[in-house]
Structures are given as C-alpha cells and as structure tokens.
Amino acid sequence: GKYVTIYQGLKQRRPDLRIGWYTDPLRRDYWRAKKLPGATEYKAWQSENNDLGAIMAPFTDVYFPSVYWFYPRTTHPMEADYLSTYIHENLSEMKRIRRTYGRAEAPIYPYVWWNIANGSDVPMPLDMWETMVRVTLDEADGMVLWGGYQQPWDENAPWWVTIKARLTDKRRTG
C-alpha cells in the first residue's frame, strides 16, 4: 500500500533517513494483551499484527509503538495492576513482529505520555508513571515523550523528575 510507496519514495531521495510510523505495524491492545500468550484473544491480536507486520515491517527502519495508558485508577481500579503487563506484552509483540518480518537492528522507541490518555489531561499517578518509564526503558531501546503542547515548562513536574532520575540511574549503572 501507501506505506510502501511513501517509504520507497523517501528512501530514493534520502537513503540516509530512518523511517518509522506511529504505532504501526503493531496494533496497540490492552484487553487482549493482558490475556497473555496462548489465549484465543491474544492469538487473534497476533494474527492482526502478522497481517500488518508482513506488509510494513520490511519497510520500517525504526519502530514507534504507542503504550499510552487509558484507564484512571479512580474509575478502573483493577486495571492499574495490569500496566506493566500491558507494556511488556505490547513491546514483546513489537519485538516478535520485528524479528519475524523486519530487521533485527531496527530500534524500538515507544510513545509514552505522562497523562491518562482519555481526553481528560489528568496526569497518571506517580507510581504508575514510574512503572511506565521503568518497564519501557528496560524493554525498549528508548522512548518518545509525548505531551506538553501549550503548557509552560516546569522543571519540577513529577513526570520530568522521574525521567531525569531514571536517566541519571541509567548512566551511573551503565
């Protein structure tokens, strides 16, 4: 499709560019990912990802899956327990697609956001944000921080303090 045409056209003009697509070729999924491998729903999710991965992964130099979180603890208290599972399973599935259809050297940089992604602009509880940062940086090659549009910069914002602490720890511990 059009992804392939765009990729090939860009590469003809600029072979040095590393091209990736927001979310694709992985269909972000919370409900099926938390079922874990082997479940019928999980296998259906993998099948959808296979269909898209077979087309797109060969034409992807860097992967940008999205692991935004949609469920406030106040209205979905049980779902918070699955945050690390959701991130882990989505990144594991992205790695499977890359391994099966793409290039092993292509990095994975998930999009993350410190707000609950349900249209409310409410920050994630700090413990959940720390979990998101830890799991993402432990299992991916980095991350893309999303958000902050038309917001004044706050050096002491809890989300930023968490990022700085994690990056400092990474450098100190190698």
Residue spans of the language-model regions?
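Aromatic-lined carbohydrate-recognition surfaces of secreted/lumenal glycan-active proteins
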Residues: K2-N49, T100-N118
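Extracellular/periplasmic catalytic domains that process cell-envelope and extracellular macromolecules
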Residues: R13, I55-P58, Y101-A104, L137-D138
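Short, flexible/disordered intra-domain loops and linkers
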Residues: W31-A44, P72-T85, G119-M124, E155
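Aromatic- and acid-rich polysaccharide-binding/catalytic face
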Residues: A39, W45-D81, D141, L145-Q151
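Alpha-helical scaffolding within the catalytic cores
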Residues: T40-A54, S84-R98, D127-M132
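Glycoside hydrolase catalytic-domain groove-lining segments
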Residues: P58-F59, P65-N118
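Substrate-binding cleft of secreted/luminal carbohydrate-active enzymes
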Residues: T60-D61, V67-F70, E105-G174
